[in-house]
């Protein structure tokens, strides 16, 4: 379990995190249960930072990056929390992601290999392991990514695909050479693979294994109420830094309070709402089944079709479940959430 929570109102902001982090090593993933994930981003101003997910970014611990940033920030401040986050991201990029060129190259080749494995599995499952259909499905999957019009991730809004393709060509060639049984001498397929990977990288909804959620929260120098900005960090490759905006929240004249949950939110939801999400869903299912059975029982125990039609139209299982949900949400809001605010 790894989770973050922020509670803000017009008076203050409170942030908290559990102590579990995931550390990625060349040999796999390791979970550490005694880590600190909440830090002051500035020694002089009310700005904090917390994270969840992978504890390392490009092999460097997030905690180390935060301490280095805080040291160089000194007593400087920014007008808004958004500017603090932008400066922090710029600090990471300007320091070459705190890793060598060799590490960046190796990480990119690992991402290309993961992409190949993803497409391979989808194609194999779709083709039902029939070799005659596999290559066709492999090409179809690559083409579907190329033609997908999904919005780009935050850092690739002005993405120049041809520049990225040029920078990864050599790395893609290494991965393609490892899988000669699939690519062979098929030059168009090789070009399609490279283009599809570039599109996959740019798409905002693409998933990568080593994700770190960063949350910056507090008061900008020109902000009288607290605000929160968060991004998901993935990787850096020379001038290409992949990250995506996640949750944004702020207190305003019209919005007097906010609760933000990140990471594995099921435990936090249980704590805040007073009921587990799965239990809530089970309650709706049980109530829906009960009303359906009751309706059928009543219909089966009347003689005339007119009476059956009246019962059938009077008892709407869907509306009853919706009414239960609305009632329960009101109770949760009044008894569990409102006291926090």
Put a short name on every predicted segment.
Residues 1-341:
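N-terminal nucleophile
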């Amino acid at each position: 379990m790894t989770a973050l929570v922020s509670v803000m109102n017009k008076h203050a902001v409170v942030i908290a995190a559990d102590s579990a982090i995931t550390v990625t090593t060349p040999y796999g993933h390791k979970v550490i249960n005694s880590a600190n994930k909440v830090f002051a981003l500035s020694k002089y101003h009310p700005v904090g930072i917390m994270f969840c997910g992978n504890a390392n970014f490009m092999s460097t611990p997030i905690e180390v990056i935060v301490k280095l940033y805080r040291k160089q920030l000194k007593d400087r401040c920014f007008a808004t929390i958004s500017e603090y986050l932008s400066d922090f991201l710029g600090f990471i990029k300007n320091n070459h992601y705190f890793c060598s060129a060799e590490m960046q190259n190796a990480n990119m080749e690992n991402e290309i290999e993961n992409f190949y494995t993803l497409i391979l599995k989808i194609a194999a499952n779709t083709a039902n392991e029939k070799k005659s259909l596999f290559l066709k499905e492999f090409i179809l999957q690559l083409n579907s990514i190329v033609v997908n019009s999904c919005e780009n991730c935050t850092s690739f809004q002005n993405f120049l695909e041809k520049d990225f393709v040029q920078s990864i060509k050599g790395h893609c060639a290494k991965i393609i050479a490892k899988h000669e049984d699939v690519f062979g001498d098929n030059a168009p397929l090789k070009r399609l693979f490279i283009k599809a990977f570039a599109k996959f990288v740019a798409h905002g909804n693409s998933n990568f294994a080593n994700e770190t959620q960063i949350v910056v929260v507090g008061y900008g120098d020109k902000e009288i109420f607290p605000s929160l900005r968060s991004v998901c960090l993935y990787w850096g490759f020379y001038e290409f830094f992949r990250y995506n905006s996640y949750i944004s929240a702020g207190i305003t004249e019209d919005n007097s309070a906010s609760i933000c949950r990140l990471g594995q939110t099921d435990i936090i939801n249980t704590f805040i709402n007073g009921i587990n999400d799965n239990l809530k869903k089970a309650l709706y299912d049980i109530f829906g089944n009960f009303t359906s059975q009751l309706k059928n029982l009543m219909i089966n125990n009347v003689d005339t079709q007119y009476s059956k039609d009246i019962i059938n139209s009077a008892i709407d299982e869907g509306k009853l479940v919706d009414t239960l949900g609305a009632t329960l949400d009101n109770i949760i809001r009044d008894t569990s959430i409102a006291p926090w605010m």
